[in-house]
């Protein structure tokens, strides 16, 4: 279970991430959480992980919030159903990022459907879910410090560079093999003439 000291941290993390995502979509103007660069390394890490998640799973995850047909009367039930389904196989950091992205998408859909009061409620549900359903797992997995170590301080960019570097090496080898094969074929052709 979460300690009382973690509650403001969780609330601030949720508010920062949701505000950041709403601003990305052009829904929020003015000062508030999520505006500008995040000073807190945890907030920076969650923003980067959320952006990476959306980039990788845009097709799969896009329009999920719209497909739920959320109304003020059904929003909490839908939120809980999707969250429970998301963690059905057990929590991990990737699913936790998906949870944040889903919550922010639900907030954006609420603004889009002119149900702005739901934004604050969804954030409260996110905080409550984190503190009641996921706090023990987060704590036993190294806490938010472990998340920040895994996803913060450019770790995602470095992993992407390594992945792209590995694929670039594979592409180079394959291209070289194809070119060598073509040269051998051309050489054999001219040798037979």
UniProtKB/Swiss-Prot annotation:
A motif (BH1) lies at residues 85-104. Keywords: Acetylation, Apoptosis, Membrane, Methylation, Mitochondrion, Phosphoprotein. Disulfide bonds: none annotated. One of its GO terms (biological process) is regulation of apoptotic process. The modification N-acetylalanine is found at residue 2. It is a peripheral membrane protein. A motif (BH2) lies at residues 136-151. One of its GO terms (cellular component) is Bcl-2 family protein complex. The keyword Mitochondrion applies. Interacts with HIF3A (via C-terminus domain). Interacts with BOP. PANTHER family: BCL-2 RELATED (PTHR11256), BCL-2-LIKE PROTEIN 2 (PTHR11256:SF13). This is Bcl-2-like protein 2. It comes from Homo sapiens (Human). The gene is BCL2L2.
């Amino acid at each position: 279970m979460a300690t009382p000291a973690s509650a403001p941290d969780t609330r601030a993390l949720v508010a920062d991430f949701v505000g950041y995502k709403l601003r990305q979509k052009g829904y929020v103007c003015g000062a508030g959480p999520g505006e500008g660069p995040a000073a807190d390394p945890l907030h920076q890490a969650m923003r980067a992980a959320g952006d990476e998640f959306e980039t990788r799973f845009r097709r799969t995850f896009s329009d999920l919030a719209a497909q739920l047909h959320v109304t003020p009367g059904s929003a909490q039930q839908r939120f809980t159903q999707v969250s429970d389904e998301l963690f059905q196989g057990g929590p991990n950091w990737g699913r936790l990022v998906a949870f944040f992205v889903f919550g922010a998408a639900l907030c954006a859909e609420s603004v889009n459907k002119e149900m702005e009061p739901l934004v604050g409620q969804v954030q409260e549900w996110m905080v409550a879910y984190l503190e009641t359903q996921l706090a023990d797992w987060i704590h036993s997995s190294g806490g938010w410090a472990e998340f920040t170590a895994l996803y913060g301080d450019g770790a995602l960019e470095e992993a992407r560079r390594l992945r792209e570097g590995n694929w670039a090496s594979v592409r180079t080898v394959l291209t070289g093999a194809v070119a060598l094969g073509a040269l051998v074929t051309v050489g054999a052709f001219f040798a037979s003439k």
